[in-house]
Swiss-Prot record:
Organism: Karelsulcia muelleri (strain GWSS)
Protein name, as recorded: Small ribosomal subunit protein uS5
Lineage: Bacteria, Pseudomonadati, Bacteroidota, Flavobacteriia, Flavobacteriales
Gene Ontology annotations for the cellular component aspect, listed alphabetically: small ribosomal subunit
NCBIfam families: rpsE_bact (TIGR01021)
Subunit (UniProt): Part of the 30S ribosomal subunit. Contacts proteins S4 and S8.
PANTHER family: S5 DRBM DOMAIN-CONTAINING PROTEIN
Recorded domain comment: The N-terminal domain interacts with the head of the 30S subunit; the C-terminal domain interacts with the body and contacts protein S4. The interaction surface between S4 and S5 is involved in control of translational fidelity.
Pfam families documented for this protein: Ribosomal_S5 (PF00333), Ribosomal_S5_C (PF03719)
Gene: rpsE
Assigned protein family: Belongs to the universal ribosomal protein uS5 family.
Length: 171
């Protein structure tokens, strides 16, 4: 996982996916104040993903703000050939736990709701996923991105251990 630099972000063609829009209300003695929150995921379907949470008086403004925040939080994720991940990974954010696992070719994305939208935005095509605990969409997305950011390729593992790649693959 690497955080993208400003000049790298400009070149990307990002696809935006709206996960949720929520109307919230602040009640005072005099009246009720309504506003909107929006959760947006942006990704290039080639290993780059980001999420944003925006708040505004109008729904369109909240969606726009969320999209701009998502552009600022882009991460590069390691994807291996076949559209899957290198190894199993689990992550927890607040009450939400997410477990992602590589799958064989032709399996597709088996995941629910918010987790699925993150995996699609990254560009994964064959992944198994299980979400436990809280079903809060914001926390599930943060846990999924945390799990994806913990993924390591064979090259990084070989560098950390100071041994050759073939020794890791063969054993």
């Amino acid at each position: 996982m690497t955080v993208l630099k400003k000049n790298e972000k400009i070149k990307l063609e990002l696809k935006e996916k709206l996960v949720m829009v929520n109307r919230v209300c602040k009640v005072t003695k005099g009246r009720r104040y309504f506003s909107f929150t929006a959760l947006v995921i942006k990704g290039d379907e080639n290993g780059v993903v980001g999420y944003g949470f925006g708040k505004a008086k109008e729904a369109q403004d909240a969606i726009y703000k969320a999209g701009e925040k998502a552009k600022k939080k882009l991460l590069k994720i390691n994807i291996i050939k076949g559209g899957t991940i290198p190894h199993e990974q689990e992550a927890k954010y607040c009450g939400a736990r997410v477990f992602i696992c590589p799958a064989s070719e032709g399996t597709g994305i088996i995941a629910g709701g918010a987790v699925r939208s993150v995996l699609e935005a990254v560009g994964l095509t064959n992944v198994l996923s299980k979400s436990k605990g809280s079903s809060n969409k914001i926390n599930c997305i943060k846990a999924t991105i945390l799990a994806l950011s913990k993924l390591r390729t064979v090259n990084t593992i070989a560098l950390e251990r100071g041994i050759s790649i073939s020794k890791i693959l063969i054993g």
